[in-house]
């Protein structure tokens, strides 16, 4: 497992690599993604071949949505919604607000359900929650971030506040997410 010596060495410059698909499989049955209204960019939708794509039971068993204005999943798809801002964590406590959600998403995924964790662009809010699910599964924070960037986009967790939160977790904080 990777463990950066200095956090600033890990926070690298971003590239012009937006995701080329609405949803990306990070690990078997565990997906990260966005919504159809990402930036209102129809050109991106055409490139990604996702115009008119809705979430149905054929796609996912469970959807965890972290963008309050997202279109809901279709009938018979279990969906949990908790909107929060893609910004600083000054008025938001991840443990208080996300721990139960992360436990539920992890439990659904480990029970064999196909799980989507999504926000608007599929980069930051979904990124912090996906990283916490991976941490719960035993990943180190840096390894979880690298996996998401390798699978989805180098822009995952371009919100440095979210990235720093994950990379600065103490052993005691990691234990909270893992138990």
Where are these regions (language model features)?
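A phosphate-binding catalytic loop at a beta-strand-loop-alpha-helix junction
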Residues: 112-131, 135
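Short, basic/low-complexity N-terminal boundary segments at the transition from targeting/disordered tails
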Residues: 1-10
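Cysteine-based protein phosphatase catalytic domain of the PTP/DSP
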Residues: 11-115, 135-168, 173-177
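Short intrinsically disordered terminal tails
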Residues: 1, 178-179
């Amino acid at each position: 497992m990777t463990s950066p010596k200095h956090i600033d060495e890990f926070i690298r410059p971003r590239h012009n690599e937006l995701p080329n698909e609405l949803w990306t499989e990070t690990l078997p049955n565990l997906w990260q993604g966005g919504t159809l209204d990402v930036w209102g960019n129809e050109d991106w939708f055409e490139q990604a071949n996702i115009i008119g794509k809705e979430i149905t039971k054929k796609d996912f068993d469970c959807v965890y949505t972290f963008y309050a204005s997202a279109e809901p999943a279709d009938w018979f798809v279990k969906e949990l919604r908790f909107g929060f801002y893609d910004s600083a964590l000054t008025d938001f406590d991840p443990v208080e607000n996300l721990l139960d959600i992360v436990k539920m998403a992890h439990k659904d995924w480990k029970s064999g359900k196909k799980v989507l964790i999504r926000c608007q662009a599929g980069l930051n809010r979904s990124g912090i929650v996906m990283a916490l699910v991976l941490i719960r599964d035993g990943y180190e924070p840096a390894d979880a971030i690298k996996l998401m960037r390798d699978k989805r986009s180098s822009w995952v967790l371009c919100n440095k506040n979210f990235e720093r939160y994950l990379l600065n977790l103490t052993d005691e904080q990691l234990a909270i997410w893992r138990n």
